[in-house]
Amino acid sequence: MQEQPVIIIGAGPSGLATAASLNLHSIPYIILEREDCFASLWKKYAYDRLHLHLHKQFCQLPHLPFPHSYPRFISKQQFVSYLDDYVSHFKITPLYCRCVELAVFDEITKEWTVKVRNLGSGEVEEFRGRFLVVASGEATDPYTPELEGLKSFPGDVLHSTQFKNGKAFRDKNVLVVGSGNSGMEIAMDLANHGAKTSIVVRSPVHILSREMVYLGLNLLKYIPLNMVDWLMVMLSKLVYRELSKYGLSRPKEGPFFMKVADGKYPVLDVGTYSKIRSREIQVKFTSFSRNLRIALQFSLLFLSSLVLGTHNYYKSFLMQN
């Protein structure tokens, strides 16, 4: 049993920021991380061309600004370098390979007990503290849908967390399942590398530029959300015109409302839409249930590879009273 006033779960950017803030106030803590490094999503599970979608002023961690030389939209490599400097500067030392299995609050002692599996030794370890900070992210584990025909599909099947770049897919027929930001950017990267790329778009999407979102985030400080949403939709229509020509449609709800209500992000376009318009990326299905049967008929698509941009899911370890 180890005791500290504060237990932080997760050594991603949020966990590191919490640790740095506690360090500055000389508050003892322990930070538990499932992977063998901090910021594993960025270091191990992100595709090469990834850039921060938001302006750097919205993304830097507290107490240490980005270098002045960094561009407005920071690359994956630059962000990882910044996090390396951040951890070194604040002398943050996570406990790695600790998978949290259970966290429970004792109403009598007013303390949290956290049980973790040491992935190195296999032993269960226990930590206790007055405060618990859950910084494990919105989603922690790759979601692979149970699609009929997927197990018998003879080609390559990758989740977006396994995808690095499209070099190996040149001249191959690749279908990307999922039209969030990861799916859209991966489709563009595949097309840039010469793959014959198709993408499944299962629901209406808002397509905005990064500059539109930057404007919207600043306007939200001064005017109501519904007015900002109206402006974002008008700007999107002005720039991207009629989406239905290319198998896409816009939701009825506004982009910022959907983020607040459902946690669904708009697609921040960094070049994918122009490739959809030029037909370099084919929108093959606008209604895609849980069935891959059609997609796997080689007479139709001659697929050689499948990339699942189906996001991640959150696995809870908090015990409910």
Segments and roles (model prediction):
Residues F58-P65, S249-P255:
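Short, basic/glycine-rich phosphate-binding loops at helix/coil junctions
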Residues P65-P71:
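A short acidic, helix-capping loop that chelates divalent metal ions and anchors anionic groups
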Residues Q2-L41, P71-N321:
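Flavin (primarily FAD) cofactor-binding/catalytic cores of flavoenzymes
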Residues K44, H63, D171:
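Phosphate-coordinating loops and pocket residues in cytosolic domains that bind phosphorylated ligands
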Residues Y47-Q60, G149-L150, M319:
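Short, flexible, mixed-charge acidic loops at enzyme active sites
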